[in-house]
Amino acid sequence: MTNQDTTIRPTPEAMLKLAQAEEAQSGQGRLKVFLGYAAGVGKTYAMLEAARERKRDGRDLVVGYVESHGRSETDALLAGLELIPRRELAYAGVLLPEMDLDAILARKPQIVLVDELAHSNVPGCRHEKRWQDVEELLAAGIDVYTTVNIQHFESLNDLVAQITGITVRETVPDRLLDIAFEIKL
């Protein structure tokens, strides 16, 4: 008995190359989410370590907004990365720093780091929420690395309130997890 099946199967490498080509043609940036369960668990640190690896690989990468919270280890990881200066916006008589979305779009890096996805922007920003800024960056074809805690996702808001007794006011639509090309815990 002979096998008449002469179908040639593509190699995994060929399939990966095809998927990457299709992704590049879509014009849409890719989202990488560094997900944590609480403040201080190392999301920003992990994001910066991944960013430094991409930089060593030759990727064009900028820091759109990272909050080090005064941690020297986090500040050390920022050294040598290109920082997009923050915008200062007046609110309630105080100047507050915000991510400069227009400067990032004008610079058009391959990858931008955007800390604190659930952040509410100061009135006067183009978008009410930072996750909306991220959607605009993705639509412009820029890959985004971002950080967020699990309790900020809309579908978990009620559950978190029941467990902790705290209502989380800054929420992120679940669809951002759905579109993420990678989620790091």
Where are these regions (language model features)?
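Short gly/ser/thr-rich secondary-structure transition/capping motifs
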Residues: 15-18, 92-98, 165-167
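Conserved P-loop
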Residues: 28-106
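Conserved nucleotide-binding/hydrolysis micro-motifs of P-loop NTPases
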Residues: 53, 67-72, 118-119, 144, ...
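Loop/turn-to-beta-strand initiation segments
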Residues: 60, 108-111, 137-146
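Conserved ATPase-coupling elements of RecA-like P-loop NTPase cores
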Residues: 116-131, 155-158
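Internal gly/pro-rich beta-alpha loop/helix module
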Residues: 146-185
